[in-house]
A protein has these predicted regions:
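Canonical Rossmann dinucleotide-binding motif of NAD(H)/NADP(H)-dependent dehydrogenases/reductases
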Residues: 7-43
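Short C-terminal tail/terminal secondary-structure segment
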Residues: 235, 246-260
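A glycine/serine/threonine-rich, flexible loop-to-helix segment
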Residues: 55, 162, 184, 196-219, ...
Length: 260
């Protein structure tokens, strides 16, 4: 009997990676894994300040397109997908790895959060996934995969995480809704939930070093996960072998979340 198992290779597939800031970014670990698996990539950078940090990384993975995209700028977002359609005529997978909350709303109590801060955190951290998915789906003509990044703070009250926990909870709900709506087009939608990783975004969380120490102490594997491990998981979920998984939040945190 011959078994035709789905392939884990990304050879011949085209992917868009959103969220690289530097070599410590989770999105960078994912981009490296996508490239190693054979994908051709388009990579975005936030603004001119970020460009000199991101462009060398894009070149390192032979990105076909390196484009500016601030998700608060609808014209820039539309331009990215227009460039992808013009260059490739299709898109096979999308990685959304961005989040933001004003520091006072991140560090402060939720009950004290500002309306503007809450709205901006939700817009950048959650609704941007919806907007990108709306533009990506028509290009996924043969099906595809959409991935985003969450955190355990979506489900538990994490110290110094403020309204970001609410935004991540909404992001996970959006993941489920999008998976149901896009499933008929053979598009999977999943969130990956890594444990604490020392990224630039994480550096904005107060007492993050203590959070990492606690994670290492309590996780069954007694270590943190790496961006390379998160990237390997993302590559699996983006590949044909991972397309049977959808609407899920896949945790990769050295087992920390199972320990009370």
């Amino acid at each position: 009997m011959t078994h035709n198992a789905p392939r884990t290779s990304l050879k011949g597939l085209k992917g868009l990676v959103v969220g690289i800031a530097n070599v410590h970014s989770i999105a960078w670990g994912c981009a490296e894994a996508f490239k190693a698996a054979g994908a051709e990539l388009a990579i975005t950078y936030l603004n001119e300040k970020a460009k000199p940090h991101v462009r060398p990384l894009a070149e390192a993975v032979d990105a076909t397109l390196t484009l500016p995209m601030d998700v608060e700028n609808d014209a820039e977002v539309a331009a990215v997908f227009e460039e992808i359609e013009a260059k490739w005529g299709k898109l096979d997978f999308l990685l959304h790895s961005i989040a933001f909350a004003p520091l006072q709303d991140l560090h402060g109590r939720v009950v004290d959060s500002s309306r503007d801060g809450f709205n901006r955190a939700m817009d950048i951290s959650c609704h941007s996934l919806i907007r990108l998915s709306r533009l990506a789906a028509p290009l996924m003509k043969d099906g595809g995969a959409i991935l985003t990044m969450s955190y355990e703070g979506a489900n538990r009250v994490a110290p110094n995480y403020g309204i970001m926990g609410l935004a991540k909870a909404a992001l996970e709900a959006a993941t489920r809704a999008l998976s149901a709506e896009l499933g008929p087009a053979n598009i999977s939608v999943n969130a990956i939930s890594p444990g604490p990783i020392a990224t630039r975004a994480a550096s904005g969380i107060l007492e993050f070093d203590q959070l990492m120490e606690d994670s290492v102490k309590n996780a069954p594997l007694h270590r943190m996960v790496t961006i390379e491990e998160v990237g390997a998981l993302a590559a699996l979920l983006a590949s044909p072998a991972g397309r049977g998984i959808t609407g899920d939040v896949v945790v990769i945190d050295a087992g920390r979340h199972i320990v009370y």
